């Protein structure tokens, strides 16, 4: 089949780029041809080595907009979305199936007012999770699309329903792991003999309360050598200055800081270089949206310390690390201390669980599940 991907989200890198890459490379491995359709001004941050079709209408970014500008940008994006949908419908002879890899209920709402809903080819919208507050909007839009059986909503989640609800055009499947694709890497089968390297990676923003985390880490007692590596990329000057202040403040505390953005092979080498990953993020949305860093850890088979609202279904099935009660800083310190001190005796437990999780959520299995949804029998409604 010739699989088309419609991508309209411009990002400097990270999980969005890697997710598209999974679709491209895994579907190619299954014998399919892949092409992209993108807005006229779209700039790729990675060369997927695929043909590209351009659509009239500029991609809109919210990164530097606020207030009225943000409202104007949102309105402009909705207008352009209808233009893109119409053009995709007109060009459907150029592909056998269409995937929109990062969608929300707004995409479906717009589809209900577009000729694209009558497409003759399988069209799959991938939603990366659904919050309780938006579930009714999602189901309302999905119900209206039931007469159009070429339209499928693929929800990345755990289980076979969305808050106990099912529709014939909604397909829950597990998300894929992120794996090293540009470096030679084999998961370690040995417990580290030197210092246990724990990585805390991601974008730094002042509201993340990094200093509280560092103070908790430094206050505990460890029975083995340990090194904390903190990587932070910053988008705004005020965040950059604040991160530099923190680096200076903790310069003599045995913590390694990396103030830089990491993409591609650099990012992969950084993840591969540590023994475990720290994920202290606490927010209700993590219960409903799959964690990109958690599925990076599984893909690289790195044990984790994470809050208990980080995809709890995964931890119920696989002991890939330890969790602490979300938002409880004291418990984070206690769990982190025991994780480090007991790492040697628990490492084989983690390894077995990570191998099993990596197989269950592998990119190969993800592509197989998505292909099954795309190729299922359809009849135009």
Where are these regions (language model features)?
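A short, active-site helix/loop in glycosyltransferases that binds the activated sugar's phosphate group
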Residues: 132-172, 177
């Amino acid at each position: 089949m010739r699989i088309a991907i419609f991508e309209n989200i411009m990002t400097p890198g990270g999980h969005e780029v890697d997710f598209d890459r999974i679709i491209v490379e895994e579907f190619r491995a299954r014998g399919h041809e892949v092409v992209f359709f993108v807005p006229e001004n779209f700039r790729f941050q990675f060369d997927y080595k695929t043909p590209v079709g351009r659509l009239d209408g500029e991609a809109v970014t919210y990164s530097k907009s606020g207030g009225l500008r943000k409202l104007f940008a949102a309105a402009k994006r909705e207008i352009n979305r209808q233009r893109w949908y119409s053009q995709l419908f007109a060009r459907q002879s150029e592909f056998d199936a269409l995937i929109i890899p990062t969608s929300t209920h707004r995409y479906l709402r717009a589809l209900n007012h577009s000729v694209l809903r009558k497409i003759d080819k399988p069209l799959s919208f991938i939603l990366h999770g659904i919050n309780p507050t938006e579930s009714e909007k999602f189901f309302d839009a999905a119900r209206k699309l039931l007469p159009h059986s070429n339209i499928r909503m693929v929800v990345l989640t755990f289980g076979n329903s969305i808050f106990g609800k099912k529709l014939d055009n909604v397909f829950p499947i597990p998300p894929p792991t992120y794996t090293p694709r540009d470096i030679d890497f084999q998961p370690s089968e040995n417990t580290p003999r030197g210092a246990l390297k724990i990585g805390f990676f991601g974008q730094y923003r002042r509201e993340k309360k990094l200093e509280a985390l560092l103070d908790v880490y430094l206050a505990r007692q460890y029975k083995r050598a340990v090194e904390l590596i903190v990587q932070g990329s910053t988008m705004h000057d005020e965040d950059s200055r604040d991160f530099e202040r923190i680096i200076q403040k903790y310069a003599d505390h045995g913590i390694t800081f990396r103030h830089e953005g990491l993409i591609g092979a650099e990012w992969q080498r950084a993840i591969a270089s540590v023994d475990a990953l720290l994920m202290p993020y606490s927010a209700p949305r993590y219960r409903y949206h799959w964690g990109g860093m958690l599925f990076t850890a599984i893909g690289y088979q790195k044990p984790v310390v994470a809050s208990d609202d980080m995809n709890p279904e995964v931890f119920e099935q696989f002991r890939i690390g330890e969790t602490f009660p979300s938002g409880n800083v004291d418990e984070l310190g206690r769990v982190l201390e025991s994780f480090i001190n007991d790492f040697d005796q628990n490492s084989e437990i983690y390894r077995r669980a990570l191998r099993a999780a990596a197989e269950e959520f592998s990119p190969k299995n993800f592509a197989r599940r998505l292909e099954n949804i795309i190729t299922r029998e359809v009849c135009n409604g």
